[in-house]
Amino acid sequence: MKGFGWLEGLLRVGRKLFVKAETVQYPEVRPYLPPRSRGRIVLTRDPDGQERCVACNLCAVACPVGCIDLAKAVAEDGRWYPEHFRINFARCIFCGYCEEACPTAAIQLTPDFELSEWRRDALVYDKHDLLIAGEGKVRGYRYWSVAGKAIQGKDKGEADHEAPPVDLKGLLP
């Protein structure tokens, strides 16, 4: 049936003519996001209001594209905290490896995906941009009370819900 290609095209267009359009009016109509969708990264706080991040650098090591940069500092009481914490969202692929690697549940991915900017340098978020006021998804978790690390004023085993260290030599026969 040579020469009837125009008729096939006309029929295809005619079938789609009366079908409802699939265009979504985005800003007014929000798309459905699955419950575990991964979007913008945030840093959370303890129930006491302190930063959860202990600058262990596991998130930066786990990141496959190397978009996380941080430097560790030590507070007066012996706690570690990030002196600076930067995420370059222009490079981030939102894989969630940083969230899985974080031992303190400080890094969490939210369903917020609207990160468009006019300039690329605006997509580099600092610690003050990433910190939120709440605890995020993990409630009531205090890393420093279960870490087993001595801080000023408390030796190992003196924190809440913490057993004293085991004397290994005392276990020998």
Swiss-Prot record:
Its EC number is 7.1.1.-. It comes from Rhodopseudomonas palustris (strain BisA53). GO terms for cellular component: plasma membrane. It is an enzyme of class 7 (translocase). NCBIfam families: NuoI, PRK05888.1-1. Its cofactor is [4Fe-4S] cluster. One of its GO terms (molecular function) is quinone binding. The gene is nuoI1. HAMAP family: NDH1_NuoI. This is NADH-quinone oxidoreductase subunit I 1. It is found in: Cell inner membrane. [4Fe-4S] cluster 1 binds at C53, C56, C59, C102. GO terms for biological process: aerobic respiration. The keyword Iron-sulfur applies. It catalyses: a quinone + NADH + 5 H(+)(in) = a quinol + NAD(+) + 4 H(+)(out). It comes from the Bacteria. SUPFAM superfamilies: 4Fe-4S ferredoxins. Belongs to the complex I 23 kDa subunit family.
